[in-house]
């Protein structure tokens, strides 16, 4: 699914501008969910705010497949769009915000459950392959939803079967792989260290053992990407 943004161009991420928001919030909790998502996205360094679909295509045109960014959606029903460079060019996927969670928009005819997350960063991380895993799986033989979920053909030895996702666009079946975010600015050393620490904290007990100020700093951005 390809979208085209109607928002004004902007090369860098910037504070939330409510004048650009055409979609209304369904509740106070949804408003808070989106505000928190924007705050973390601005910390991420790969939130390009109001760049257009055409500008996203230009930004990703010279990048390898798997490079991605998050931008504001042009669709009045959605807040964010995931733009990703695939083996068949740049594709734009809307990020839905419903029922207090975010998910990638999928084919409504699909009976498969769509992964949902309380944070856009968690959604992005879910679709990224683990370290050492092959980037692009072989397409399944049976068609499914627009972003369907199928077992990977060759999981790593000793690891559970990976899930592979595919984009169905214009009759094409394209692997959805998020390998590397496209940075919109230079990350601080503190942020780089925080991402590294987040990637090594695999249990809540480890987090509770850290000093209070460090825990608070990590809570402000709790993703390894």
UniProtKB/Swiss-Prot annotation:
The UniProt record lists the keyword Protein transport: no
The Gene Ontology biological process annotation of the record reads: branching involved in labyrinthine layer morphogenesis; cellular response to interleukin-17; cellular response to leukemia inhibitory factor; cytokine-mediated signaling pathway; intracellular signal transduction; negative regulation of apoptotic process; negative regulation of inflammatory response; negative regulation of insulin receptor signaling pathway
InterPro entries per record: SH2, SH2_dom_sf, SOCS3_SH2, SOCS3_SOCS_box, SOCS_box, SOCS_box-like_dom_sf
Q: Specify the effect of residue 41 to R.
A: Complete loss of EPO/LIF-induced signaling inhibition. Abolishes binding to JH1
Q: Where is this region: Kinase inhibitory region (KIR)?
A: 22-33
Instruction: Supply one GO molecular-function term.
Output: cytokine receptor binding
Query: How does it get modified post-translation?
Result: Phosphorylated on tyrosine residues after stimulation by the cytokines, IL-2, EPO or IGF1.
**SH2 domain location:** 46-142
Q: In which tissues is it expressed?
A: Widely expressed with high expression in heart, placenta, skeletal muscle, peripheral blood leukocytes, fetal and adult lung, and fetal liver and kidney. Lower levels in thymus.
Q: Which PANTHER family does the UniProt record give?
A: PHOSPHATIDYLINOSITOL 3-KINASE REGULATORY SUBUNIT, SUPPRESSOR OF CYTOKINE SIGNALING 3
Q: What is this protein called?
A: Suppressor of cytokine signaling 3
Organism annotation: Homo sapiens (Human)
């Amino acid at each position: 699914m390809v979208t085209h943004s109607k928002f004004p161009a902007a090369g860098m991420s910037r504070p939330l501008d409510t004048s650009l928001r055409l979609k209304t919030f369904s509740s106070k909790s949804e408003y808070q969910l989106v505000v928190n998502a924007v705050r973390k996205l601005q910390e991420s360094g790969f939130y390009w705010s109001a760049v257009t679909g055409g500008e996203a295509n230009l930004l990703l045109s010279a990048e390898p497949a798997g490079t991605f960014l998050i931008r504001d959606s042009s669709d009045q029903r959605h807040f964010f769009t995931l733009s990703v460079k695939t083996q068949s060019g740049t594709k734009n996927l809307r990020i839905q915000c419903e029922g207090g969670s975010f998910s990638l928009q999928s084919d409504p005819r699909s009976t498969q459950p769509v992964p949902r997350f309380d944070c856009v960063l968690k959604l992005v991380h879910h679709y990224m392959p683990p370290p050492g895993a092959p980037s692009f799986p072989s397409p399944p033989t049976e068609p499914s939803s627009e972003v369907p979920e199928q077992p990977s053909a060759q999981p790593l030895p000793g690891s559970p079967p990976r899930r592979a996702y595919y984009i169905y666009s214009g009759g094409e079946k394209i692997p959805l792989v998020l390998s590397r975010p496209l940075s919109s600015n230079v990350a601080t050393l503190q942020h780089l260290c925080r991402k590294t620490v987040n990637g090594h904290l695999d249990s809540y007990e480890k987090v509770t053992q850290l000093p209070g100020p460090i825990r608070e700093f990590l809570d402000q951005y709790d993703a390894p990407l």
